[in-house]
Structures are given as structure tokens and as C-alpha cells.
Amino acid sequence: GGIAVSASDTSAISAASAQVNVAVKGGAAGLSVAYLDIDNSILAGSQGATLDSSGGDIAIDARSRSTNLIVIAGVSYGTFGAGAGNAGSSLINNTSVARIDGGSVDAAGNVSVVSDSKDVSTITLGTVSVGAVALGGGVGVDLLGSTSEAWIGGGARVSAGAGGAALSVRDDWNNGWTTDSHKGVVVLATSEVSFTSV
């Protein structure tokens, strides 16, 4: 059989916040705030190790799949004046690394070193203000700065016999990843982020 070294992260945070303010005689104001932060390190690799697979592939795989979801709603009512405000901030700053650092890696099949990051952030804001003078607003901030790395270094010796089935490898982006088949040694880092603020 083959050898697989893998690490993955599927962190998910959801936050919901609501505020209601009512002033029968006078003014009303309300504010809702939510902040989410995911900052993880995902590492799969070998360091100064000897990996030998005489019957298959050697795969080193690091994957990041983080999700932030913020939903905020605010309602304010004041006879004379009303104000409602919402603010949401979503940070995803992961580091995903797949590596062969020194040592020797020999496979009868293929050797793959793959790091893949796909992070999703969604912020939904809503405000309702009712009064003689009414103000409402919302601010959503998405901060996505994840890093994806795949490498071979440290004087490592890597050999792949390219026997058996080919690897399906991401090749290009065209409104979605396209794939291609490859044999031998594959070193690949990919990153995809998606954010929606409403």
C-alpha cells in the first residue's frame, strides 16, 4: 500500500446578534456588534524522515476549510427619533503548509505534496428604525488573508517510479478549478476565498 500524511482543519464559527430599542416618549438608539476570528496553522509533512513505499503512492496533504457566519439584526422605535446600527467583522487568517523537509522519499507510484485552502465568510446585516427622524446603517468587514504553501527542501531526495494510476491535479481556474492528470512528483499549493456581505 501507499503512505499518507495528512492534516486538515474545518473550523466554523457562527454568531447571531439582535437588539430592540423602544422609547414611547423620546428617542431610541441601538447598536449590535459581532467579531469572529479564525487564525490556525495546518501542517502536514516529513522532516529528515525516510519514507519508502514499494507498493503505491506517497501523499502529503494539508487542507484548510474554515467558515465564518455572522447574522445581525437591529430594530429601534422612538416617538421623536430612532437610530439603529450594526457592525460585523470576520477574520480568517490560516496558514496551510505541506512539505518534505530533508530526508528521503521513495515511491513506486507517485509522490504528491499538496496544500489546499478554501475559506468562506458571510456577513448579513439588517436594521429598522422608526421615528419622526430615523437613521439606520450597517457595516460589514471581511478580512481574508490565508496562506497556502507546498514545497520540497532541506536537501531532500525524492524519487517517484510513476507506476499505477495518475494523480488528478488542479490545473487552472475558470469559474471553478479545472483538473488534469499527472504522474511522478507533484508539488501544488492552491487557495480559494469566498466572501459575501449583505
PLM region spans:
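Low-complexity, glycine- and small/polar-enriched segments
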Residues: 1-198
